[in-house]
Every structure is written in structure tokens, then in C-alpha cells.
Amino acid sequence: MESIMNNIVAERAAALGCTVIDEALLKNYTTFKVGGKCGMIRLNSAASCGELVNLMNELGEEFIVLGKGSNVIADDNGTEKIVLLIGDEMSDIDIEDDIIRCGAGASLTAVCRAALKAELTGLEFAYGIPGSVGGGVYMNAGAYGGEIKDIILYAEAVSRSDGSVRRFSPEEMELSYRHSRFMQDDHIIT
């Protein structure tokens, strides 16, 4: 059987310490439990994301980005595009001086629990929102009168065009009701 994923990309991803899954089933990565086969790379850092994005651009390989897979309906026929998964490997949560810093793969619920344990307030609205921090920033998630835009200090993202990492201020993210610049932008929240 022929491999779904470009071998050059798979080898580079493995060398960077990412997990390569040649025939992942998207249904195992979406909350609706739908989706067919794909070549998947479980990213482990913004740096590996940037390097792989650069390589895929050079090779003309198309890719899509997936977090916790909430609000995603994937085709049961799968995709030929490489799926870059921002998952548990990018879900660290650190708290210092009343500031929570976390990876885009962290679940919103896990960040809320960490805030509660550290006796921090402001994230109560996000408890129970399915999905990741990256997805929450991407669509300015909110509930019960609170939104991500009310609490975020900055977001780091990788450029889809050149793989560089950039930090965005709340103003630069253009956060509004269920919207951010990332919906029309060429950056991957990390």
C-alpha cells in the first residue's frame, strides 16, 4: 500500500521529535467522531511547526491544522492534505506572577482548572467550553458574558508563508464576537 504522507516531510517531522501517523483516522480526533484517513503529524513545538511549514511550502504540500477537533466536521473520505495536530505535546500550562502561559493544545477546561488551583479568577466563563486554547483564541470563544479577548495578553503564532514565529497583542488579534484576525490570516496559533 502506498504511503499517504510525503516521505521527506515524514522523515523531517520524525527527526524534529514529532509523532508521524501515516494513516490516522480523523474520526479519532474530532468531537463529532467523523472523518477518514489522513497523514498526520503531532507537532511538539512552535519551532517544529515553523520548520515543517517551511518544508511543506518548498515541496508544494498542502496542510491543514487541527486542535481538539471540536466544531469540526471532517470528510469521511479523508484528505490528501497533511494534518498538523496541535495536541497534548503543545499543552503545557505554566503559572507565574498571576499570569498563565499555555500552549495552543491545552484544553480550555484544563487551563480553567489550573487557574482555580492557583486561586486566579477571570477564566470562569471558559470552564466547559470544548476545545483547545488555540481554537478558543482563533474564534474568540466565550460564554456567560466572558470572552477570550477579556483575558488574553498575547498569542504566539507561526506564519504559514515562511514559518516564522510572531507574538500578537490583543489589538493585533482583532478580537470581536466569535472572530479574530486568524480566521483570515496566514498564522497558526501555537
Where are these regions (language model features)?
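Structural signature of FAD isoalloxazine-binding scaffolds in flavoprotein oxidoreductases
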Residues: 35, 39-47, 73-91, 138-169, ...
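Anion-binding (especially nucleotide phosphate/pyrophosphate-binding) glycine-rich loop
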Residues: 4-133
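Short beta-strand or tight-loop elements
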Residues: 121, 151, 171-173
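Flexible, small-/acidic-enriched active-site or ligand-binding loops
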Residues: 172-182
